[in-house]
A protein has these predicted regions:
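Long hydrophobic segments that form regular secondary structure
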Residues: 1-56, 93-94
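Beta-strand-rich structural segments
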Residues: 2-5, 47-48, 83-101, 107, ...
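Solvent-exposed serine/threonine-rich low-complexity stretches and specific carbohydrate-binding patches
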Residues: 17-27, 118-135
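Short aromatic-acidic-glycine turn motif
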Residues: 23, 67-71, 109-126, 178-180
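Short, hydrophobic beta-strand segments
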Residues: 33-39, 132-151
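Extracellular Ig-like/FN3 beta-sandwich strand-entry sites
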Residues: 39-43, 83-85, 153-155
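Edge beta-strands of extracellular beta-sandwich domains
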Residues: 52-64, 166-175
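Low-complexity, acidic Ser/Thr/Pro/Gly-rich terminal tails and inter-domain linkers that flank the onset
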Residues: 63-81
């Protein structure tokens, strides 16, 4: 069962390029179209129409085996002085960059330079580790680290590693603080 939410007039659902038909949406239907779909790996795309014109679309793809870590940082520059924080998210992705939510891998974090690791974890509600641990199993394909800028300016490099993946690294710039 696939639920497609849209503020348009109707939604068309495609499975691996084949249309599964259009269904109406609207306030009387709680802006939701319901499709009965047999699972197939590949691509599922919903296209929203309003007045016959495409209003928007959303695509989901089946993830393949994990081949890499993808890291995103909440910011790339911090101010020295031990007040600024950055949240780094490391996701397990396949060769096409699709996040794999199902595979579990232990991920290790290493922090070098002008800052420190404040905490590291996966968000798994049933885990028993400490946020000070340097290795966590992914949960829903993800781990997160929080780093804090140090007292002095300079580069702050955060490296994530997992079995079967190349290391993923982000270098943040810790700038001199404006406060004295």
């Amino acid at each position: 069962r696939v639920l497609a939410l849209s503020a348009g007039d109707e939604v068309e659902l495609f499975l691996n390029g084949q249309s599964l038909g259009k269904k109406p949406v609207g306030e009387e239907l709680a802006l939701t179209a319901v499709f009965q779909v047999l699972y197939q790996p590949g691509e599922l795309k919903a296209v929203s129409y309003k007045g016959g014109a495409i209003q928007g679309e959303c695509t989901l793809r089946t993830a393949g085996p994990v081949s890499a870590l993808r890291v995103e940082a909440s910011r790339l520059a911090l101010s020295a002085g031990e007040q600024d924080l950055c949240i780094l998210t490391a996701d397990l992705v396949d060769e096409q960059g699709v996040m794999n939510l199902w595979e579990v891998k232990p991920v290790t974090v290493r922090v070098e330079g002008a800052g420190t690791l404040l905490g590291f974890g996966s968000g798994n509600p049933s885990c028993s580790g400490s946020y000070q641990d340097l290795c966590w199993d992914t949960f829903d394909g993800r781990v997160q680290a929080v780093v804090r800028a140090g007292k002095e300016p300079g580069p702050l490099t955060v490296t994530f590693s997992a079995p079967g993946c190349s290391d993923a690294q982000v270098t943040l710039l810790v700038n001199p603080s404006d406060f004295r």
